[in-house]
Regions:
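C-terminal interaction appendages of subunits in large macromolecular complexes
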Residues: 2-3, 9, 13-298
């Protein structure tokens, strides 16, 4: 059993897999940008997708190349200068944590690669790493050093967009996955609408049949004596002959049996006006579903 997804979840969340001689890494992408790209594809318009990370930061996508095998990106932390002696990191690179970033900054300080007095990790809901600089140190030079010697800059190299198709790995691109996912979503939506259409048409048929059964007093046949139950059912079927053109589908024996098995209480309380209202409501729903099917890409 499979549970179909109507959204390119693989591209939104990203994924990583390792096999013998092969590593696959698909970076996460922005939800809204994926939606916009899907719409552009359906409208036969060009689109470009780049990774986007929940941890924030800045990204150099010049080597991304639509996620083709061997592509690469560089990710940087967002560092701001609070004053001449203080720097603050508010967004961290993808694949790092505030703990690992803090540790890399401390180690760079111990090696003399950057000159700092201390590092405070004030992270709660959002990242906030405060770096206190040593006296006389340039904030701009320290920022450059942080990118050069710590996890404030991370290179993601040899990325590979690979999916399993027919039990075999297949190298592909981000845009190809998005197009396939969008087509699949279109198929799922069409499938759901067709199921809904069938259900509504079936409901319309049954209620219309029931209305004729009571309004034309066909149920009275059940009060007559008959040689057998089959003869009585056959007579009821024939009684519907003048009204078959009012229906959209053929009347089956199961339809007739369903009507014959209704209890007397149901017959006595049947409300023709309510049935007419139900039929009108179903017809309104049918129009909407048919419109949605005809304009599914609009």
């Amino acid at each position: 059993m499979t549970l179909p997804v109507k959204f390119p979840l693989l591209l939104a969340q990203g994924a990583m897999g390792i096999a013998v001689g092969l590593k696959c890494e698909i970076l996460p992408h922005n939800f809204n940008e994926l939606i916009d790209a899907s719409i552009a594809y359906l409208r036969d318009e060009p689109f470009v997708l780049y990774p986007d990370f929940r941890t924030g930061g800045m990204i150099d996508v010049r080597g991304y190349n639509d996620g083709e095998r061997g592509c690469k990106v560089q990710v940087r932390a967002r560092i701001t200068q609070l004053d001449k002696k203080t720097l603050v990191i508010t967004e961290i690179p993808y694949g790092t944590t505030t703990g690992s970033l803090n540790e890399s900054i401390t180690m760079a300080g111990e090696k003399g690669q950057i000159k700092i007095r201390r590092v405070d990790d004030n992270t709660s809901r959002n990242a906030e790493i405060v770096i206190h600089l040593a006296s006389g140190v340039s904030p701009d030079q320290t920022i450059d050093a942080l990118y050069a010697f710590t996890q404030c800059q991370v290179s993601l190299n040899s990325l590979c967009t690979c999916v399993i198709r027919n039990e075999h790995p297949e190298f592909t691109t981000i845009s190809a996955i998005l197009k396939e996912s969008t087509d699949r979503t279109l198929d799922l939506l069409s499938w759901e609408l067709k199921i809904k259409l069938d259900e509504l048409e079936r409901d319309w048929h049954l209620i219309s049949l029931e209305k004729i059964f009571f309004e034309k007093r066909i149920y009275k046949i059940l009060e007559k004596d008959a040689d057998s139950w089959d003869d009585q059912v056959a007579e009821i079927e024939r009684a519907f002959d003048p009204y078959r053109q009012m229906l959209k589908t053929e009347i089956t024996r199961d339809d007739v049996l369903r009507l014959c098995e209704k209890p007397v209480r149901k017959i006595s309380k049947f409300d023709i006006k309510k049935a007419e209202e139900q039929i009108l409501d179903i017809e309104s729903q049918l129009e909407k579903v048919k419109y949605d099917l005809d304009h599914i890409v609009d």
